[in-house]
Amino acid sequence: MNGINVTITDMMNCRDRRVSIQNELISKYDKPVLSFCMNIPGPVKTNEQIRKAFDSGKAELLKALSAHNITILHTEEFHEPSGDELIMALDAPAEDIKTLATEIEESHPLGRLFDMDVIGTDSMKLSRGTYRKCIICGCQAQDCARSRKIPWRNYRRRLRNY
């Protein structure tokens, strides 16, 4: 698959930056923050196909926020080898935002590859309440990821066929 291979260190640095931005936005606005990135197995975290899927998820998210009259207070967007990311401070209750995000993750054809986290003003991530299913086999996604029972190439094929 085309793209730049990233290391675990790259991913940890990306995570640290994301948490720092989330905390800054919560401090600045005293409102919940939504972080959207992709759950992509393997060493390549972005390329043209993955970006297309990310953009589709972003469009769906923006449409849902608009439909529910949720004001976007601040947006940060990154497209780096470690992946595509969108971080937003939103003027709405965290639970309402999480409900919208979960609906998108569950209804979009590639929603199982979307990672839409909502962080409340207490800096705690809201839980989905239910486990996500693997986009390939339908089992609990966490189990598939931990056991690596499905080769990452199968996920890439799914992206190509989207």
What are these regions (language model features)?
Residues 1-65, 96-120, 126-162:
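Long, contiguous binding/interaction regions
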Residues 64-100:
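Helix-adjacent hinge/juxtasegments
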